[in-house]
């Protein structure tokens, strides 16, 4: 009895990661220009800013790490109370591919060294909250 040889190549499943978003909450008035100047762990060519949008992009291996100013979206009284209680002056949405997590952590550590702050989840109550060291 002869078996047919399976000529079909098996597809290797490639982990493409997931895009996730958190809020980087900063206790200082900073702009994307300040953010980009504080990041040294990536090549200069990998960093780009759009000052008119208050947006920074850092090209990483799987995708880009993007910081976008989100202060205008925190308009509810509860939001403002939260920000005031935590001493937050600026909020940036930070979105990235989970496959880039190690490099994202390095970038966040550099930003934290320069400006302080913490990460909050993109949820209704902003929980859980992470210190940069635990992120």
Question: Residue ranges of each PLM-predicted region?
Answer:
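Acidic, proline/glycine-rich low-complexity IDRs
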Residues: 1-22, 30-49, 95, 102-135
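Short, intrinsically disordered low-complexity segments
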Residues: 26-99
């Amino acid at each position: 009895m002869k078996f047919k040889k399976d000529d079909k190549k098996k597809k290797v499943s490639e982990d493409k990661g997931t895009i996730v978003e958190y809020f980087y909450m900063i206790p200082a008035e900073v702009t994307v220009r300040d953010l980009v100047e504080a990041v040294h762990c990536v090549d200069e060519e990998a960093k780009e800013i759009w000052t008119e949008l208050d947006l920074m992009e850092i090209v990483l291996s799987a995708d880009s790490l993007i910081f976008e100013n989100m202060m205008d979206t925190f308009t509810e009284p509860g939001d403002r109370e939260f920000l005031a209680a935590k001493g937050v002056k600026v909020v940036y949405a930070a979105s990235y591919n989970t496959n880039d997590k190690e490099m994202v952590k390095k970038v966040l550590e550099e930003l934290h060294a320069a400006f302080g702050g913490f990460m909050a989840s993109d949820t209704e109550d902003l929980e859980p909250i992470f210190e940069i060291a635990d992120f």
